[in-house]
Design a protein with these regions (language model features):
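Active-site adenylate/phosphate-handling loop in enzymes that bind or generate adenylated species
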Residues: 353-412, 484, 493-513
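Short beta-alpha connecting loops at secondary-structure transitions
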Residues: 166, 294-295, 341, 385-393
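Short glycine/serine/threonine/alanine-rich loop segments
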Residues: 317, 341, 363, 485
C-alpha cells in the first residue's frame, strides 16, 4: 500500500523541477512511511510513498521493465500476483524482487493496457512508457484506491492519491465548485468524477487513461477507456442450495487470498453480520488467534461493543476495543486534513479511531465493507420496496393522499407523511434518490436560499439508469455501488486507515465475488423484509444465531444528542464566527432555523449541522488565494 503522485507535460513545455514532485510526495507520508522513490524525464515525473506489506525489503518503487523503458508506481495490493508471475516467467521475464508491483510492470510490457483486466486486487497505477512517450493511469474495478488528476497550470497535468498532492504544486490556484458544495449537502459526499475544486477530477473506477504530450505546443492525445463492467444478467439458474455452496466458496476464497502478508494483520469487528462473517472465515485459515478491533459508544442505541465481544469470544480472537465519546469531535480538523474535501459521513470518526487502535498492533486489516451493496442489506432497499407496493396498491393516488394526511396531522408525523407523498410523486430514479438524500430541496433552500439547486440529483441520476438491468431494484444496487460505495464508504475507509499508516482489505468487494453476487436472483438478496437472504444462510454456518437476527446499526454516531449537549458550544462558535458569516455561502437565517429546530427537538438536524461544521472547518484550511465559483 502506498501513495502516488506525478506530473506530465501536455504540450511539450518543461515540467517544474524535481523539488515539486518531492513536495507532492511529502504530503502523503502517512500513506507510506517506509520508503520514497521518484523518476523523472523531461516530459513526465512519477513518485510514491510506500507502506511495505509484501516483500518488505525488496519492494522499492518505481519498478521497471523493458530495460528501464517502463517505469511504474502503484498504490494497492494484487492478490493474484504469484499466478501472474508464473505466466510472465514462462514468457521469459526475469524478476528482481518478490513484489506484486514488479508483476504489474512486466504485465504491462507484455500485454499493454490489457493487463489491468488481469489484476485481482485494489490499485491506482501510474506508468511512464518511454517507448510510446505516454503516461498511463489506471484504477481498480470498484474504486478502492483513489486517483485525482487535473491541469494545474497551462500545459501541466498533475495526479495523486490525495488532493493535497496537487495543492503542493506551486502556482496552482484552486477554485471551489459551489455545485460540488451543494452535491455535498444533498448526498453527504462529492460524487465522482467531480471534486470540490473546479477542473480537478477523479479517474473513474475500472478505467485507464493514456496521455501522450503534444509537441511544440500542440494538443495532447488523451484516451480514457473503461476496462471493467459488472453484469447483472443473465441470472444464475442453479437451485438455492447449490448457489449457497457457490457463495460460500466465493466468500472463503476472497478472504483466503487477502491473507497474504509479510507483516502482522487483523480485522475490524463491529459485531454486525458482514465483519463477523469475514472474521469467521479468516479464522478457518489461521493457526494463531486473529486480532480483532472494535469501537463503541456510551449511548446504548449506538453501542455494538457487546455484540462484537460475543463474536470475538465465539471465534476465540485476541480482541481490542475502545469507546468513542463526544470529545472525539475534536478530531474534526484532523479528519478534514486527511479527506482533503468536504466529507459528511460522521462515521469517519469511529472509523478513524478504530484504525488508530488497530495500527498500534498490526499494519493490515480486513474489513466487512461492501456486503450491504452486494446483498441488499441496507434498510433503504426495504423502504423503497414498501413505497413501490404502496404506489401499486393505491393506483397512483398515494402522493395526493399522503400530502393531504401530512397537512392534517401535526408535527413530525405530518412531516414524515408529506415526505412520503413527495417521494411517491417523483419519477424513477428520483423517488429513490429522494429517499436516501441527506438534504431535500426544502433543506437546500434553507441552507442556500435562492441559490439552491433546482435539480439536486443531476450529478448522479444517470448512474442509476442502466438499460441492461431489467429491474429498478437492481439498478439501485448498481447505482449505489457506483456512487455511495465508491465516494462515501471506500473514501472513508481509505483516508482513515491510510491516515494511520494502516492497510485495509475488503474481501466482500473481491471482483470474483462481485461478478457472482450480481447475477444472483434478487429474491436471494432481498426476500420480504429480510436483506442478505442467501448471505445469511452462509453466515448461519459460521456464527451464533443472535448475530444473524441482530438489528443492523451501522457505524453511526449520536450526533443528535451530541449537538444538543456537548457539541452545542462548538456549533454555536462555528456559525457565529465572523469568517463563517463573511464567506456568504449560507443563508444565515436558514442556518439559524436549522439550529433552532434541532435544539428545540422539532427535527433531528444533526447530520446537516455536522456537514455545516465540516465545510466551515475545511474552508479554514484553504490557501488564502482560493476562491469559490459563483452559485448558479
Amino acid at each position: 500500500m502506498c501513495g502516488i503522485a506525478g506530473l506530465i507535460s501536455l504540450d511539450g513545455r518543461a515540467l517544474p523541477g524535481p523539488q515539486t514532485l518531492d513536495a507532492m510526495c511529502r504530503t502523503i507520508v502517512h500513506r507510506g512511511p517506509d520508503d520514497q522513490g521518484t523518476f523523472h524525464t523531461d516530459w513526465a515525473a512519477i513518485g510514491m510513498r510506500r507502506l511495505a506489506i509484501i516483500d518488505v525489503a525488496g519492494g522499492h518503487q518505481p519498478v521497471t521493465s523493458a530495460g528501464g523503458r517502463i517505469q511504474l508506481v502503484f498504490n494497492g495490493e494484487i492478490y493474484n500476483f504469484r499466478e501472474l508471475r508464473q505466466t510472465l516467467e514462462a514468457r521469459g521475464y526475469v524478476f528482481q524482487s518478490h513484489s506484486d508491483s514488479e508483476c504489474i510492470a512486466h504485465a504491462y510490457a507484455e500485454y499493454g493496457t490489457d493487463c489491468f483486466a488481469m489484476l485481482r486486487g485494489m490499485f491506482a497505477i501510474a506508468i511512464v512508457d518511454q517507448d510510446r512517450r505516454r503516461l498511463v493511469l489506471a484504477r481498480d474495478r470498484i474504486g478502492k484506491k483513489p486517483l485525482y488528476l487535473g491541469e494545474l497550470s497551462p500545459g501541466v497535468l498533475g495526479f495523486g492519491s490525495e488532493l493535497k498532492t496537487l495543492l503542493a504544486v506551486p502556482g496552482w490556484q484552486p477554485r471551489i465548485s459551489m455545485d460540488a458544495v451543494q452535491d455535498f449537502f444533498s448526498l453527504g459526499y462529492i460524487p465522482a468524477p467531480d471534486t470540490i475544486f473546479e477542473g480537478i477530477g477523479k479517474l473513474p473506477p475500472g478505467h485507464w487513461m493514456s496521455i501522450e504530450p503534444g509537441q511544440d505546443g500542440g494538443a495532447p492525445n488523451i484516451v480514457q477507456t473503461r476496462y471493467s463492467h459488472v453484469d447483472f444478467l443473465p441470472k444464475w439458474t442453479d437451485d438455492e442450495d447449490t448457489l449457497q455452496e457457490r457463495l460460500f466458496a466465493e466468500l472463503d476464497d476472497a478472504v483466503r487470498v487477502r491473507l497474504v502478508s509479510d507483516v502482522p494483520f487483523g480485522a475490524f469487528l463491529s459485531g454486525g453480520l458482514d465483519s463477523s462473517v469475514v472474521c469467521a472465515l479468516m479464522t478457518r485459515h489461521l493457526s494463531q488467534p486473529l486480532k480483532t478491533f472494535s469501537i463503541g459508544f456510551d449511548e446504548a442505541g449506538f453501542d455494538e461493543l457487546p455484540d462484537a465481544r460475543r463474536v470475538a469470544q465465539h471465534l476465540g480472537t485476541e480482541h481490542h476495543e475502545m469507546v468513542v465519546r463526544p470529545d472525539a469531535a475534536n478530531l474534526l480538523e484532523t479528519l478534514v486534513h486527511h479527506f482533503d474535501e468536504p466529507f459528511g459521513d460522521s462515521s469517519a470518526i469511529p472509523t478513524f479511531l478504530v484504525s488508530q487502535l488497530a495500527a498500534r498492533h498490526v499494519k493490515m486489516v480486513l474489513s466487512g465493507d461492501g456486503g450491504d451493496e452486494l446483498f441488499a442489506g441496507y434498510s433503504r432497499y426495504r423502504r423503497y420496496a414498501t413505497l413501490q407496493r404502496i404506489r401499486r396498491a393505491t393506483l397512483g393516488m398515494a402522493p395526493g393522499l399522503a400530502k393531504l394526511g401530512g397537512a392534517l396531522l401535526p408535527g413530525a408525523r405530518g412531516r414524515r407523511l408529506s415526505g412520503i407523498g413527495q417521494r411517491l410523486g417523483l419519477p424513477w430514479p428520483d423517488d429513490y434518490l429522494a429517499l436516501v438524500a441527506l438534504a431535500n430541496p426544502a433543506d437546500l433552500r434553507l441552507l442556500f436560499g435562492e441559490r439552491a439547486h433546482a435539480d439536486p440529483f443531476g450529478s448522479v441520476r444517470q448512474r442509476f439508469v442502466r438499460s441492461d438491468i431489467d429491474s429498478h431494484a437492481e439498478q439501485i444496487l448498481s447505482g449505489d455501488m457506483d456512487t455511495y460505495l465508491v465516494d462515501d464508504i471506500l473514501v472513508k475507509v481509505d483516508r482513515t486507515t491510510m491516515a494511520n499508516s494502516l492497510e485495509a482489505r475488503a474481501p466482500l468487494l473481491d471482483q470474483n465475488l462481485i461478478a457472482f453476487a450480481a447475477r444472483l436472483p434478487f429474491d436471494l438478496k432481498l426476500r420480504g423484509e429480510q436483506g442478505k437472504y442467501l448471505f445469511r444462510k452462509v453466515a448461519a454456518r459460521l456464527l451464533p444465531a443472535e448475530v444473524l437476527t441482530k438489528r443492523k446499526q451501522g457505524f453511526a454516531i449520536p450526533l443528535a444528542t451530541w449537538f444538543r449537549n456537548d457539541l452545542r458550544p462548538m456549533l454555536l462558535d462555528t456559525i457565529g464566527s465572523r469568517a463563517f458569516k463573511e464567506r456568504g455561502i449560507f443563508d444565515q437565517a436558514g442556518i439559524q432555523r436549522l439550529v433552532d429546530e434541532h435544539q428545540q427537538g422539532l427535527q433531528d438536524r444533526g447530520e446537516l449541522l455536522w456537514m455545516v461544521m465540516v465545510l466551515e472547518t475545511w474552508m479554514r484550511t484553504l490557501p488564502d488565494q482560493t476562491s469559490p465559483s459563483p452559485m448558479h
